[in-house]
């Protein structure tokens, strides 16, 4: 019996070391998600408001998920150091829930990527039709056009169907150089062709999505399946600790 305890102790020590390392990496993942959520709320709010038909809580979901992972990452380290079988089982159960949630989110994002593109087309077209240069969505359109050096949905001529165009012409945010644009030029599509950006914003955004979708999906599934490693380590460690406790009785 004593020899078996001697055999299991090195295994337990090894599993504890691996699980602590994993939990630390898991904790870092939570910090990254939390940072991305805050960054997305502060920086990408204008883009998100145009991609989503209704108000979206995506940044808050990332912040909440990141915070939860940070807490459970610390819990995993504590449970590992404490060597508590029930805590390790609880940690494994949480990792399984995270795995399922990330897997569903990754599959949904990949399957519905075309719906996301269609939604962006509808919302951006609607934002152009209701553009007045002052409200939040109008400022979002201006921000996208300036930051991406684009104009309109497909191209700058899309603005000719907007009520704003009849009074003000193409928005100055379309100009390659706003100091070189005047209202008269922006009222004339022929003259404006030499003053404004030619590429449409829809093509730029969707081409970026298509180009990076494989990378994003690969990273998402990689992170999701990494939870299986943590689940395996936590379950194995819990089993060995329980077995070792029985051997001591």
From Swiss-Prot:
Family assignment from sequence similarity: Belongs to the tetraspanin (TM4SF) family.
Protein name as it appears in the record: Tetraspanin-7
Residues of this chain annotated as glycosylated in UniProt: 54, 155, 158, 177, 188
Keywords: Disease variant, Glycoprotein, Host-virus interaction, Intellectual disability, Membrane, Transmembrane, Transmembrane helix
Function: May be involved in cell proliferation and cell motility.
Residue intervals passing through the bilayer: 17-40, 57-75, 87-112, 214-234
Intervals, Cytoplasmic compartment: 1-16, 76-86, 235-249
Location of the protein in the cell: Membrane
Record-linked CDD domains: TM4SF2_6_like_LEL
A single Gene Ontology CC term: plasma membrane
Organs and tissues of expression: Not solely expressed in T-cells. Expressed in acute myelocytic leukemia cells of some patients.
Topology in membrane: Multi-pass membrane protein
Superkingdom to which the source organism belongs: Eukaryota
Signal peptide, first to last residue: none
Disease as annotated in the protein's UniProt record: Intellectual developmental disorder, X-linked 58: A disorder characterized by significantly below average general intellectual functioning associated with impairments in adaptive behavior and manifested during the developmental period. Intellectual deficiency is the only primary symptom of non-syndromic X-linked intellectual disability, while syndromic intellectual disability presents with associated physical, neurological and/or psychiatric manifestations.
């Amino acid at each position: 019996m004593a020899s078996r305890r001697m055999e299991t102790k090195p295994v337990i020590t090894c599993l504890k070391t691996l699980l602590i390392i994993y939990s630390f990496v898991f904790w870092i993942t939570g910090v990254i998600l939390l940072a991305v959520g805050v960054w997305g709320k502060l920086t990408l709010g204008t883009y998100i408001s145009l991609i989503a038909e209704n108000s979206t809580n995506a940044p808050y979901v990332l912040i909440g998920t990141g915070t939860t992972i940070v807490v459970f990452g610390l819990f995993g380290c504590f449970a590992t150091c404490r060597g508590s079988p029930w805590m390790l089982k609880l940690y494994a159960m949480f990792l399984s829930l995270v795995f399922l949630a990330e897997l569903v989110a990754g599959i949904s994002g990949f399957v519905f990527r075309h719906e996301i593109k269609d939604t962006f087309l509808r919302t951006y077209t609607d934002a152009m039709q209701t553009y007045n240069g002052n409200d939040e969505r109008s400022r979002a359109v201006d921000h996208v056009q300036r930051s991406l050096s684009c104009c309109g949905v497909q191209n700058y001529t899309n603005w000719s169907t907007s009520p704003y165009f009849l009074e003000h012409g193409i928005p100055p945010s379309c100009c390659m150089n706003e100091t070189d644009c005047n209202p008269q030029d922006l009222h004339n599509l022929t003259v404006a062709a030499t003053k404004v950006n030619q590429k449409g914003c829809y093509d730029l955004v969707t081409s970026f999505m298509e180009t990076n979708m494989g990378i994003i999906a690969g990273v998402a599934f990689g992170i999701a399946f990494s939870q299986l490693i943590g689940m395996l380590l936590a379950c194995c460690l819990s089993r060995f600790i329980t077995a070792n406790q029985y051997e001591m009785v």
